[in-house]
Amino acid sequence: MNGYGSPYLYMGGPVSQPPRAPLQRTPKCARCRNHGVLSWLKGHKRYCRFKDCTCEKCILIIERQRVMAAQVALRRQQANESLESLIPDSLRALPGPPPPGDAVAAPQPPPASQPSQPQPPRPAAELAAAAALRWTAEPQPGALQAQLAKPDLTEERLGDGKSADNTEVFSDKDTDQRSSPDVAKSKGCFTPESPEIVSVEEGGYAVQKNGGNPESRPDSPKCHAEQNHLLIEGPSGTVSLPFSLKANRPPLEVLKKIFPNQKPTVLELILKGCGGDLVSAVEVLLSSRSSVTGAERTSAEPESLALPSNGHIFEHTLSSYPISSSKWSVGSAFRVPDTLRFSADSSNVVPSPLAGPLQPPFPQPPRYPLMLRNTLARSQSSPFLPNDVTLWNTMTLQQQYQLRSQYVSPFPSNSTSVFRSSPVLPARATEDPRISIPDDGCPFVSKQSIYTEDDYDERSDSSDSRTLNTSS
């Protein structure tokens, strides 16, 4: 047993021993080696007998350790700056741990009266936690990371910046030993992508669910009422698309999910009319919804017959009449709006027929669709304006339009005098309004013909020859 204790060995001269295989080198204390003593570094720094030595060799070791600590701090700062340069400006505003530059300046310097004593080495678990916090605070380039702002880990990170300048390491190999478990464990401590943030791509839309984004909280003004729906904004309306829709579903099923209020047969006809294109079918349905919405706004007014600027009662488009979606829709094609039903009794002449609603004295069952057109203003090839009937190319409305010649006029011979005698309407030549609503109280009358029987016998069935004979 020597004078320095059992762990210490003197470096003697070469001993004649057989050569051994080179073993893995274990770190030794540099101060003890300067004084001719070998001591293992593990658990030795606090109890080293030469820790306060001020000889030339020990001072050289102290200076070398300070240079290495400054290099480590500089490398950390450069690494953080390079990572911050990759982060876009929109993500820098998010709350997160303070940068390492502020962390070093935050702790108070120790008072000068107390001698600077070396701090004990930090456990590897704390180093790994601090490294994991640093990697979590910097978002990865491929995905967004959830921000962790735990106070205990932040304090450990603050202490890490402080120990980089104040802790004295007693060997050049000691720094490698301390940094090696930090790097080895930080590689295994990468925080995986937070399960709260999910990137859902449905039809080319990237959507972020709740959590991780402060704008998606319920108290945010931008938060929608339906968090699990995707809002598709089109030129004529907005529709909410559920996240549960998959790309491999048939287009008809997708339309049923988006428009649950429409009948499946109507959706199928619209889809066939669009050639199976789902986007075009959605646009058609959205445009029809916008026209119905405009009609619902008008239905809030008193249900009376409004006149256009030119004073003609039958020159309206469909949206100018006070009708609601329940009175005029694809599902109710055989229903007549209540505001356009006239009484069969022509003796009840209101003094101002345009001021009050034109309602019959008793309810009448609906029979035929209303044909809103002016026979003199529109040709036979285009009897409707483009926005009169949105879903005109469906087979149901086409068949009803082919049956328009079977309708009869609901007006008796003297009922049009109510409108012609009104001072609001200008005097016009008598024309066939082509509104056919048969009543229970009046008998069926034959269709009023424009030509007499003698003229009709002389003319052919061709519409071209009729036009020529009329012009002559």
UniProtKB/Swiss-Prot annotation:
Keyword Zinc: yes
UniProt DNA-binding residue ranges: 29-76
GO-annotated cellular components: chromatin; nucleus
Pfam families tied to this protein: DM, DMA
BP GO terms, sorted: adult walking behavior; male sex differentiation; regulation of odontogenesis of dentin-containing tooth; regulation of transcription by RNA polymerase II; sex differentiation; transmission of nerve impulse; ventral spinal cord interneuron specification
DNA-binding among keywords: yes
Region (Disordered): 89-128, 155-191, 430-472
InterPro entries, sorted: DM_DNA-bd, DM_DNA-bd_sf, DMA, DMRT, UBA-like_sf
Keywords assigned by UniProt, alphabetized: Developmental protein, Differentiation, DNA-binding, Metal-binding, Nucleus, Sexual differentiation, Transcription, Transcription regulation, Zinc
Free-text tissue specificity from the UniProt record: Expressed in testis.
Compositional bias annotation for Basic and acidic residues: 155-179
Pro residues bias (residue ranges): 95-123
Localization per Swiss-Prot or TrEMBL: Nucleus
Domain DMA per the UniProt entry, residue ranges: 249-284
GO terms for MF: DNA-binding transcription factor activity, RNA polymerase II-specific; metal ion binding; RNA polymerase II cis-regulatory region sequence-specific DNA binding; sequence-specific double-stranded DNA binding
Chain's role: Probable transcription factor that plays a role in configuring the spinal circuits controlling stride in vertebrates. Involved in neuronal specification within specific subdivision of spinal cord neurons and in the development of a coordinated locomotor network controlling limb movements. May regulate transcription during sexual development.
Additional detail: DMRT3 is a marker for a subset of spinal cord neurons (dI6).
Description of how the protein assembles with itself and partners: May homodimerize.
Similarity section: Belongs to the DMRT family.
Notes concerning its domains: DMA domain interacts with ubiquitin.
PANTHER family tied to this protein: DOUBLESEX AND MAB-3 RELATED TRANSCRIPTION FACTOR DMRT, DOUBLESEX- AND MAB-3-RELATED TRANSCRIPTION FACTOR 3
Official protein name in the record: Doublesex- and mab-3-related transcription factor 3
Organism: Homo sapiens
Gene: DMRT3
